[in-house]
Amino acid sequence: MDNPFVKTVDTIAETISNEIKVNQEEVFRFLMEPVKEEYADFSFPIKRFLNNPESIVLKIYDSLKSKNLKIVNIELISGFLNIKFDEVKLFEKITDYIKNGGGIKTKKSEKQLSIVVEHTSANPIHPLHMGHARNTCIGDTLSRLLNARGHKVNRRFYIDDMGRQVVIAALGFKTINENPMELSKKINVKPDKLVGWVYAVSSTTLDALNAKKKNNIEEAEKLATVLTRLKSQDPDNLFDNLFSGLNALNDPEKEISNIMINYEKGLEPEKSLIRSMTMSVLNGFIETLNRLDINFDNWDWESDIVWNGLVDRVINLAKNNKYFTKFKDADALDIPSIINDLVKEDQKISKIINLPKGFELPPLILRRSDGSTLYTTRDIAYSIYKFNETNADKVINVIGADQRLPQLQIRLALLGLGFKKEALNLIHYDYEIVRLPGKAMHGRRGEYVTLDEVLEDIKNKAIEELKNRNPNINNDVANEIAEKIAVGTLRFSMIQLNAMKPLTFDINKALNLRENSGPYLQYTYVRALNILEKHGKINYDAIKNETVNHKLRRSMLIKTLKFPLI
């Protein structure tokens, strides 16, 4: 037996679609837009699609009537088709549905797709911090929602192990001649935290050397202050050895360049050095992600994309492509020509790519004159890999709004190289930054608030509140409840706001039971369960359907029934 509410909404969407010749999914999206309860339960802006909607409304009404849909009323008001349920008749049908074993289940998509969601993909140079929190929570929530809709979802983490930042961290460990995993065990420090400290000291020391070389005294003094702070955070008397070792390098830039080029070629000892360091950071990531109940199906190494020859194939494809060019003495793709030839001339492609008006893009460099590749080149290869590996219909990249330009360049490059399907089905799910009141985040200087620290802060505050409310609570029970509150608080805070709005995270506000917060949601859920438990088995035959006429009861009924459609 089908859910009568969901079935009715589907029938309404199908009827409107047939009458006005608009895709049913588009009709459904409009129906799901928020509407004021006093006007309707659902509303459709029919005036957007028809100049004279009055004649169609009667047809829609007759069509719904012929399908025996007597539980809805339809009105045309100011160009909107307002749909309101007869709550008594609806409630009667819903109680029959429940008595026959029906329940509230998420509506499955008519067309179930294979979808890749790549998210988090943090640089393996320090712990996951609040700058990553929104990405990881949005990515995991999106994956769960798509899965609930019946899509086959593949969750992937891209390990960016070929960037300059990773090389700087690796140079730090090379300088002190330590293996990060072994050292972290020996000194009992979480491996990602250890690598983050070594990276910050190495990066700041090298920048200070560069400032002195340029005789920039003011900058050198600022960096000296940063180094003093980092020295005070030394986990095991490592600072002096690391600082002096980096200062002793004849040419740090040449050292960095050599490590980077050799690692891209897969040569030893650079391969073992960077792989072992990166693995130690990933172990730290996994420990944090496990607390948040976030898992991945695949961990993809950027270096594997290079070593497997996928990047070379992309460059060879480009060289034999009419859009290949030279830009700043480097191999490149002529992005402006791709836009003129393939985007501006095709209305459908233009709508999907959605180029900002007046936005001009330069050619995209694929390989530097020294033979090394850029991360955008590797991202092009990785995008093709994600589609091919999973036979994906869609690939969603959850990446910050600051990466709009590179993400746009990748799609245009794919289009120019002949990967039209991939270009049009690669989706950039962007989001704005997370701020912490009074806190600056700067990974190169070791300035960040880690997810571990935030979870512990929330957990400790939750334990304090639990003990205030119930002084006799068992410590283990309090700890278990507080952990769930901490995870719920963080996850809810990261996804409740529109992704395109900057988010300021305030722990006290996030924990406030009087606010729209994770703990409030958890409390409401537990309270509702307790009420149902105390009530016992519900005798649906004894319910008077007319009682649903009450404004609040009606509102609760409609909102609850809308849940599977969201």
Task: Give short role names for the model-derived ranges.
Residues 1-22:
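Generic start-of-chain signal for non-secretory N-termini
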Residues 24-49, 53-566:
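NTP-dependent nucleotidyl-transfer catalytic core
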